[in-house]
Amino acid sequence: MAKKDYYEILGVPKTADEREIKKAYKRLAMKFHPDRNQGDKEAEAKFKEIKEAYEILTDAQKRAAYDQYGHAAFEQGGMGGGGFGGGFGNGADFSDIFGDVFGDIFGGGRGRRASRGADLRYNMELTLEEAVRGVTKEIRIPTLEECEVCHGSGAKPGSQPQTCPTCHGAGQVQMRQGFFAVQQTCPHCQGRGTLIKDPCNSCHGHGRIEKTKTLSVKIPAGVDTGDRIRLAGEGEAGEQGAPAGDLYVQVQVKQHPIFEREGNNLYCEVPINFAMAALGGEIEVPTLDGRVMLKVPSETQTGKLFRMRGKGVKSVRGGAQGDLLCRVVVETPVGLNDRQKALLQELQESFGGPTGEKNSPRSKSFFDGVKKFFDDLTR
């Protein structure tokens, strides 16, 4: 019976990277693990199939060989003289000829080292005030931690993992493939070089247990959306005493009702009435440090920016503090009573109408442009 494609076993495309392959393996291994399917021979066979596919596709050299030659790259006789040796003499060094493809598949391989723990990611949402000032937050994350009973060995206290009698601790076995020898993962110990005869009752021989741990994370002042904080060694525990992975805290800053942030500068809109815009005055504006007075000069136009130095965000990497830029928005009055309408009518007449040249230079420029446009059309 033909063996199933390794990519199909893990449910990943042939273009999948190592991260995608590991994610698929972890999901399937949890589903079909013998400890969760005791007595289920079909699940046990599926688990072995998944593990075999994972070991091949996460080894760069073996994956390259599989992509080029399929299962024949690893099966007894699959790469014999007919497959590779037809054009070479008996004295050829096949490990040199095919080294670029197979790497350390040829020659004396080494056992699989215990894997470093996986890195973890935590998405943390902050308010703008928390991001600007810095904050310490407690988080809870599900992870794999070293078993406290066996200290990660997987063996019951008082016992030790035994050297694999098949590979004698090498983690690999040598098989003859036509004119040369090929190293394969030891099928007895799955490449670890050791066997656990008496597994730990707490972790069932895995050396790690699932836990949810609480961490206190210090967020420095000045962080922004997209910043990432690394907590070394706070990821998943490694296998058999290998180093733990890292935890990466990904920052996301919530939208603020008043301020917008661009780099280390803050922006806000300040509405003023048209009388203040024309005559000038002072208005109270918010900052992250409290309220301050902004002086508005006379004849201020809508969209005018006023810079308040040092009222922005201090860079997380040090250096000068950003500024607060207040954008003035001149509001048109609404809900006018008869007296206010009469006063405005009188004011407009004093301007010489809607396009008064002296008091509304932009209006004059605009209407002059409109007149020229229509004059040009009629010529």
From Swiss-Prot:
Q: Do you know which Pfam families this protein is assigned to?
A: DnaJ, DnaJ_C, DnaJ_CXXCXGXG
Family membership noted in the UniProt record: Belongs to the DnaJ family.
Q: What does this protein do?
A: Participates actively in the response to hyperosmotic and heat shock by preventing the aggregation of stress-denatured proteins and by disaggregating proteins, also in an autonomous, DnaK-independent fashion. Unfolded proteins bind initially to DnaJ; upon interaction with the DnaJ-bound protein, DnaK hydrolyzes its bound ATP, resulting in the formation of a stable complex. GrpE releases ADP from DnaK; ATP binding to DnaK triggers the release of the substrate protein, thus completing the reaction cycle.
CXXCXGXG motif repeat windows = 147-154, 164-171, 186-193, 200-207
Q: What is the lineage of its organism?
A: Bacteria, Pseudomonadati, Pseudomonadota, Gammaproteobacteria, Enterobacterales
- Record-annotated J domain positions: 5-70
Q: Can you state the subunit structure given in the record?
A: Homodimer.
Q: How is the cofactor bound?
A: Binds 2 Zn(2+) ions per monomer.
Under HAMAP family, the record lists:
DnaJ
> Which residues participate in Zn(2+) 2 binding?
C164, C167, C186, C189
Could you tell me where this protein is found in the cell?
Cytoplasm
> Which cofactor is essential here?
Zn(2+)
User: What's in the keyword line of the UniProt record?
Assistant: Chaperone, Cytoplasm, DNA replication, Metal-binding, Repeat, Stress response, Zinc, Zinc-finger
UniProt keyword Zinc-finger, yes or no? yes
Q: What is this protein called?
A: Chaperone protein DnaJ
State the SMART domains in the record.
Answer: DnaJ
Q: What main location does UniProt list?
A: cytoplasm
Q: Where does Zn(2+) 1 bind?
A: C147, C150, C200, C203
Instruction: Fetch the Gene3D superfamilies from UniProt.
Output: DnaJ domain (1.10.287.110), Heat shock protein DnaJ, cysteine-rich domain (2.10.230.10), Urease metallochaperone UreE, N-terminal domain (2.60.260.20)
One cellular component term (GO) for this entry is: cytoplasm
Q: Which organism is it from?
A: Cronobacter sakazakii (strain ATCC BAA-894)
Keyword Repeat attributed? yes
Q: Molecular function terms in GO for this entry?
A: ATP binding; heat shock protein binding; unfolded protein binding; zinc ion binding
Query: Zinc finger spans (CR-type)?
Result: 134-212
Q: What is known of its domains?
A: The J domain is necessary and sufficient to stimulate DnaK ATPase activity. Zinc center 1 plays an important role in the autonomous, DnaK-independent chaperone activity of DnaJ. Zinc center 2 is essential for interaction with DnaK and for DnaJ activity.
List the CDD domains.
DnaJ (cd06257), DnaJ_C (cd10747), DnaJ_zf (cd10719)
